[in-house]
Amino acid sequence: MIYPFFCASLPTLLPGVPPELSVEDFDASAREYLSAADFAALISIDSKNPAEYSVEIYRKLREFQDYLKWKIALLRSERLKRSDRFTPPDEFFGEVDFAIPVLAAAEPVEREKLLDALIFQKLDELEIFHEMDLTALCIYRLKLGILQKYAKWNEINGKNNFEAALEKLAADFNEL
């Protein structure tokens, strides 16, 4: 089913720009416009069990994320000279292989930002040919979640929390 009025009312999402609405606000609006079955499919991504995903786009995104994690684990095990065995995922995403060495070497926060940028880019690709349908709304919700995560981040508070944690660790270490 298509939802032209609902889709047209949604603000545009751009990478790096805080969203104008939250996932919760989007879900509240979606509940009004979508059928009960489509709304259940839309929020099926919230399930921790991929078998419960009702929309194909969620399964495709999960395969993409699994591939990224597999490549990072493989590269890190090679770098650490470990003999871990990793089973490759079914799908191959060669378009991101150039970024894997950067991801494997990055600090955790930077790695997460880079992964989210790759996921956002993949969502843009998956959005092609899906305008105003349930898949487009699912992609919109995923992008909104990524952008909302970074809108809540505060570098100053994060830095202060990090420094406080380091001071506590240093104090605990000095007590030993």
Question: Model-found features: residue ranges?
Answer:
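Extended alpha-helical surfaces
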Residues: M1-L176
